[in-house]
A protein has these predicted regions:
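Enzymes that bind and transform nitrogen-containing heteroaromatic metabolites
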Residues: 3-4, 8-50, 66, 106, ...
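Acidic, glycine-enriched active-site microenvironments
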Residues: 12, 27, 52-53, 59-60, ...
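Zn2+-dependent cytidine deaminase-like catalytic core
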Residues: 57-156, 243, 269, 274-276, ...
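Short, flexible helix/strand-to-coil boundary loops that buttress conserved ligand/catalytic motifs
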Residues: 126, 161, 191
Length: 391
């Protein structure tokens, strides 16, 4: 399953079955790389602004080291796997979900570490488009005499780090819009009743989605109406709660809101216009909230491209949007939604209910945002469909 359809990455890693018949047995290579990808997924939501990388080291058909990028982006997956492998890494094959880095940062280059450990062969799923790497890691490995192969499970590896690549390419995070609606696309009755449209398994999946995103965004209207916490409340996963982001151009959310009151426990950022009340701004800062100034659009509202760029500048690579119909419409209309995670419940609310996405003002079908379905899954009595925006 995909990252979104599968929710939180599986924590049990399957070991490649059987011994390799040769140094480059395709079946064994595939199983080993899939294990590396599963490890990479563990880092999602915790390693930003870095990519999530998994590494499996195999010597004579036996896994001798596993690693994945640790919270905060350090140590890297290769470093962790080499540490666990120790001397057994000499003469081994390393399966890495993304090209090993070759630049100095807070830690030495992973390419150099693989060379120094005596690894004989490196299988890489995907080359790293980061200008600091950009095939230089592969070149360095080959120059040292290591056998290097690329492209195995490249599509899966690309999806894992789609947020990292989006930030590199566009300067903003990958945006996933999560909707939970009736069959006719409503999120509440005409009087605002919305609890609960989906069942408990679907709501658990929504919390799992939060755990694999760097940040979660809602509008001020959602905060004023529902006073949400926006945390991951699955047992044992509270520490994976994402940064809470509130779009609040005039700083209308009160100090009593749970997002504000708990800002020192879970990071909370408020996106506001520079013209917002300075006294309210200071009160939020005193509560531990980070206030991010963004540019206005032509109508005096939040310019969402500017807002997402501001999040990208702060390192956010994966953003989950759970706001109401106005926020969903604004982002979709601006062509800023990259993925849709749509939960449909088997009930009807009717045309007078509140729609999941407010009006676009479209006049022609050719102007409609279009998406490609990636997966569909039954969760309890509900249906989760993942879509990708067509480029």
């Amino acid at each position: 399953m995909g990252i979104l359809s599968g929710g939180l990455p599986r924590m049990a890693i399957e070991e490649p079955a059987g011994a390799a018949k040769s140094p480059s047995d395709p079946g064994f290579d595939l199983r080993s790389m899939r294990a590396a990808l599963a490890l990479a997924r563990r880092g999602l939501g915790t390693v930003w602004p870095n990519p999530a990388v998994g590494c499996v080291i195999v010597n004579r058909g036996r896994v001798v080291g596993r690693g994945w990028t640790q919270p905060g982006g350090r140590p890297h997956g290769e470093t962790e796997a080499l540490r666990r492998a120790g001397e057994a890494a000499r003469g081994a094959t390393a399966y890495v979900s993304l090209e090993p880095c070759c630049h100095w940062g807070r830690t030495p280059p992973c390419a150099d570490a693989l060379i120094a450990a005596g690894v004989r062969r490196v299988v890489v799923a995907l080359e790293d488009p980061d200008p600091r790497v950009a095939s230089e890691g592969l070149r360095r490995l080959r120059a040292a005499g290591l056998a290097v192969e690329t492209g195995l499970c490249a599509k899966e590896a690309s999806e894992i780090n789609a947020g990292f690549f989006c930030r590199l390419r566009l300067g903003r995070p990958l945006v996933t819009l999560k909707l939970a609606t009736s069959l006719d696309g409503r999120i509440a009755t005409r009087r605002g009743a919305s609890r609960w449209i989906t069942g408990p398994p679907a709501r658990d999946r929504a919390h799992a989605l939060r755990a694999v995103h760097d940040a979660i965004m809602v509008g001020s209207g959602t905060v004023l109406a529902d006073d949400p916490q926006l945390t991951c409340r699955l047992p044992g996963l509270g520490h994976r709660s994402p940064v809470r982001v509130v779009v609040d151009r005039h700083l209308a959310v009160p100090q009593s809101a749970r997002l504000i009151a708990e800002a020192r426990q879970v990071p909370t950022w408020v996106l506001a216009l520079s013209s917002a009340d300075s006294a309210r701004r200071q009160a939020l800062l005193a509560s531990g909230v980070t206030v991010v100034e963004v540019d206005p659009d032509t109508e005096g509202g939040i310019d969402f491209k500017s807002a997402l760029n501001a999040l990208g500048e702060r390192g956010i690579t994966r953003l989950l949007v759970e706001g109401g119909g106005q926020l969903a419409a604004a982002l979709t209309r601006a062509r800023l939604v990259d993925r849709l995670a749509w939960l449909h419940a088997p009930l009807l609310i009717g045309g007078d209910g509140i729609p999941a996405i407010a009006g676009f003002g479209l006049e022609a079908m050719t102007d409609a945002p279009r998406f490609k379905r990636l997966s569909i899954e039954t969760i309890g009595g509900d249906l989760l469909t993942i879509f990708r925006a067509r480029e």
